[in-house]
Amino acid sequence: MERKFSDQELIRRTHLQELKNQNKNPFLITKVDRSMFLKDFAEKYKNFSKEELHNMDLEKLTLAGRLIGIRQTFGIIQDFSAKLQIYINKKNVAPEVFSTFKSLDIGDIIELEGVAMKTNSDEITLNVTNIRLVAKSLKVLPEKYHGLVDEEIKARQRYLDLIVNDETKNTFIKRSLIIREMRNWLDNKGFFEVETPVLQDILSGAAARPFITHHNTLNKEYYLRIATEIALKKCIIGGFEKVYEIGRIFRNEGMDSTHNPEFTSVELYIAYVDLWYIMQLTEDLIRHIATKLNLLNPTFRGFSIDLNKPFKKAHMVDLINEYVGVNFFEVKSDEQAIELAKKHHVKLLDHQKNFGHIVNAFFETFVEEKLVEPTFVYGHPLQVSPLTKKNQSDPRFVDRFELFICQKEFANAYSEINDPIDQYERFIAQLEEAKLGNDEASELDMEFIEALEYGMPPTGGLGIGVDRLVMLLTSNDSIRNVLLFPHMKDKTK
């Protein structure tokens, strides 16, 4: 396939060919012996004056980075740690060194040898004595003052976004620190980290449409996991009393500002605790991460949030009553619930024409958008919670909560079903829903039922969407901005 290049790209390719003709092909270089990172260089010499540096017998150091700016005999290079000014004096270097400097293009990756100096403006600078080109940039970086602002290009060409936008790089540094702090906190609380299969032969653990793949050797269809829940509960059954997994989840569903087909979640399970214990743990975990990284006051979706304030708690039915004026505690039949849905113009699919789904539909239609401050919503209906213990006071509901912040769900937690008979009946009910068109219904997982029959202690479980938490803490409104390489529609579509 013939490729077309811009005039600038052709000039750069000509420069590369000239280097090859001189036996200076930069792509043959395999190693650079750096003395230190740019940030460390600046830190080492920042407290010396211009005169002190000039009069000191300084050691020559080797630095490396990408050239991102040139102005006469000055330049700017950057590595992962920082940016640094460089300076070359034609009178003090060999002619071929100065010639190499003048032939460089913005974006080139270079090795530099030199000593520290300060300019009249007191800026730490590398006084260059030698230069070697170690990778030629054949593409032109975005122009300095306008930068890279097109969100589509930033997501498709994240490597370019990272080169030119410090804000993007800092977001992904924070993402790494958030996950690290989450892991450290759980480890320090005595949790045991495990890894469970991505390929699963039963669809369960969440309400979601799966990706399906084929195992050639076994000649068998598998799902990419939609949750880690079932496998982690098996660990609890096996005797691990505090387990967690941070890993990729795959759901074959729509894409929008808060959803990507593959995403990262943390799920954890603790034996001998209930929903209320998990609720406090969730608040403690999020606040700890935000405090540790100084991210307690993010702005998300146009709302300013204070994560240091106690999180609110409310029953789902009470919230519906508050915002809609309908008290579902007083509704005694599916027929009554259906009439209320008609009255309030709540659309229902065939499998949703029952009390539980209608309560949930009211909540999603009228209440979610009202929940700005961090709020634990508990008391979900039984029909939408097939893996959750029934509430002992009102078995139409279950011991489950979701955490909402700025109108979006961030966490989902249960007192887990440990009664294998109840769990079997719930799976059968899910099969009936599937017949009515619910393509997110769970399958009958007999292996899990048999595992439960050996006995699982009372258990509390929690799932948190890591990407969405990163969005909140870094004040990013789009999930694409916190995923290094998000899924995108084809350019031609």
Curated annotation (Swiss-Prot):
Binding site residues for Mg(2+) 2: E409
EC number of this enzyme: 6.1.1.6
Major location (coarse): cytoplasm
Swiss-Prot/TrEMBL catalytic activity: tRNA(Lys) + L-lysine + ATP = L-lysyl-tRNA(Lys) + AMP + diphosphate
Chain positions recorded as Mg(2+) 1 binding sites: E402, E409
Domain of life (superkingdom): Bacteria
GO CC entries: cytosol
Pfam families: tRNA-synt_2 (PF00152), tRNA_anti-codon (PF01336)
Name of this protein: Lysine--tRNA ligase
Organism per entry: Ureaplasma parvum serovar 3 (strain ATCC 700970)
